UniProtKB/Swiss-Prot annotation:
Annotated catalysed reactions: N-succinyl-L-glutamate 5-semialdehyde + NAD(+) + H2O = N-succinyl-L-glutamate + NADH + 2 H(+)
Cited Gene3D superfamilies: Aldehyde Dehydrogenase, Chain A, domain 1, Aldehyde Dehydrogenase, Chain A, domain 2
Similarity comment text for this entry: Belongs to the aldehyde dehydrogenase family. AstD subfamily.
Entry's Gene Ontology molecular function annotations: succinylglutamate-semialdehyde dehydrogenase activity
CDD domains assigned to the protein according to its UniProt record, in alphabetical order: ALDH_SGSD_AstD (cd07095)
Gene Ontology terms describing biological process: arginine catabolic process to glutamate; arginine catabolic process to succinate
EC number(s) on file: 1.2.1.71
Name of the molecule in the record: N-succinylglutamate 5-semialdehyde dehydrogenase
Catalytic site positions: 247, 281
Organism: Chromohalobacter salexigens (strain ATCC BAA-138 / DSM 3043 / CIP 106854 / NCIMB 13768 / 1H11)
Gene of this entry: astD
Length: 489
């Protein structure tokens, strides 16, 4: 399987008509993929192709659509190592983690089929001499925007349920990960998906703006930053005829009540803050620990563990815990964010540094910002802020001091503490003695506040990929025995 380095419109691979762009490996510097972006006209052609393909695809039985999706899963199995290598190269993540991402893509098919039947599907019951029937119908043409941190798994979590429901799709991946999208779309064609049911438009913000501005899409499914999600929300303002599903970021708190097992607590913090190099939307960004010996001892142990954490190139042996960020520019932004926190009074406990010039490899950063005036921003990388608290109420207040509400975690405490935390914390994913990045594949995924609205790319994705239709129906038209008051026939 080789990348086409083109757009996919109505079943045909075509060159873009706009500016040329390229994707380079953020660690090695190798050019991985280069092509021309889609023009606004080509975006409209892709939408038109999806619109034309939609009726026939929607009329097919669910079993027929499921068969195509299951063949797609088989294609992923066949090409899993090639896809994993591409993901590792594009994102900078370790090969072992890229392999787990492809595994998640494969697993998403069975999960989405189950979710379709449980969350949507069809229900019926008798009511007198009629039947009440609940059905679900696809919206039509859905635009799917993919993020760069999980370029296979997260868009897949939109696309698979959208296609199962009978929608047609126009997919706009991140310009940071065009190759993964290219290869994934080849798998859809290999699976026998009809021409036009899925289309691929490559490029940067201009392509995304053109797609979001198309009058002929019926909805947009987005996973990405709160900034871009907010722009889309404003752009869609007043368009009540369109579904907009947003899964955005978070400034996620991890609260330490006490430390029953220091090594276990340190590991949970490392996995919460630095998994994928901090490039997960559920990563802990704020570590909230008590003043005094409990907090001091934990921070000392954490600092020591950070110093030993292996960070290296994606294909290194022995394998690293995490590797590079998705781009050198992203690494530059993280280093600038650290400098800003220091300028605001933050005290570095473990300073984040670039490990190799010209690359996106960064060491983990840990900075104490207790009492500092710091922005409520998601620093999307290996940078963890420490806040100290004096009592439980202050810990909860610090945890909730954010406009976001994606994930939160509690380490230690008794059942009563957990119950109180669960009641008072504002987040869509709340974990106890497990990392904040841990989530069940058959549970909703998403948050409140500026972290989004629906629960995109997870079990509840079926909810926004189809709309319910309620019917009262009978085989024959029958005159009732008793007429309504005031009616004479």
């Amino acid at each position: 399987m080789q990348a086409k380095q083109q757009l996919l419109i109505d079943g045909a691979w075509v060159d873009g008509d706009a500016a040329r762009f390229a994707k380079t490996d953020p660690v090695s510097g190798e050019t991985l993929w280069t092509a021309t972006a889609a023009s606004a006209t080509q975006v409209e052609h892709a939408v038109a192709a999806a619109r034309q393909a939609f009726p026939d695809w929607a009329r097919r039985s669910f079993a027929e659509r499921q068969a195509v999706v299951e063949r797609f899963r088989e294609c992923l199995e066949t090409h899993r190592e090639h896809l994993a290598t591409a993901i590792a190269q594009e994102t900078g993540k370790p090969l072992w983690e890229a392999r787990t991402e492809v595994g998640a893509m494969i697993g998403k098919v069975a999960i989405s089929i189950t979710a379709y039947h449980e969350r949507t599907g069809e229900r019926a019951r008798d009511i007198g001499d009629a039947r009440a029937v609940l059905r679900h119908r696809p919206h039509g043409v859905l635009a799917v925007y993919g993020p760069y941190n999980f370029p296979g798994h997260l868009p897949n979590g939109h696309i698979v349920p959208a296609l199962l429901a009978g929608n047609a799709v126009v997919f706009k991946p991140s310009e940071q990960t065009p190759m993964t999208a290219d290869l994934t779309l080849q798998c859809w064609l290999e699976a026998g998906l009809p021409a036009g049911v899925i289309n691929l438009v490559q490029g940067a913000a201009e392509v995304g703006q053109a797609l979001a501005g198309s009058a002929d899409i019926d909805g947009l499914l987005f996973t990405g930053s709160a900034k871009v999600g907010g722009l889309l929300h404003r752009q869609f303002g007043g368009q009540v005829d369109k579904i907009l599903a947003l899964e955005l970021g978070g400034n996620n708190p991890l609260v330490v009540k006490d430390v029953p097992d220091r090594e276990a607590a340190v590991l949970s913090i490392l996995q919460s803050a630095f998994a994928s190099g901090g490039q997960r939307c559920t990563c802990a960004r704020r570590l909230i620990v008590p003043h005094g010996a409990v907090g001091d001892d934990l921070i000392d142990a954490l600092t020591s563990a950070i110093a030993e954490l292996r960070v290296a190139a994606p294909f290194s042996e022995p394998a690293p815990f995490y590797a590079g960020l998705t781009s050198v520019e992203a690494a530059d932004g993280l280093l600038a964010a650290q400098d800003d926190l220091v300028a605001r009074g933050g005290r570095p406990l473990s300073r984040m540094r670039r490990l190799q010039a010209g690359t996106s490899l960064l060491s983990p950063g840990l900075i104490d910002v207790t009492g500092c005036d710091v922005p409520d921003e998601e620093h999307f990388g290996p940078l963890l802020k420490v806040h100290r608290y004096r009592d439980w109420d202050e810990a909860i207040a610090l945890a909730n001091d954010t406009r976001y509400g994606l994930s939160a975690g509690l380490i230690g405490g008794e059942r009563a503490d957990w119950d109180d935390f669960l009641l008072r914390i504002r987040a869509g994913i709340v974990n106890w003695n497990r990392q904040t990045t841990g989530a069940s594949s058959d549970a909703p995924f998403g948050g409140i506040g500026d972290s989004g609205n629906h629960r995109p790319s997870a079990y509840y994705a079926a909810d926004y990929c189809a709309y319910p239709v309620a019917s009262m129906e009978a085989e024959t038209l029958v005159l009732p025995e008793t007429l309504p008051p005031g009616v004479v026939l």
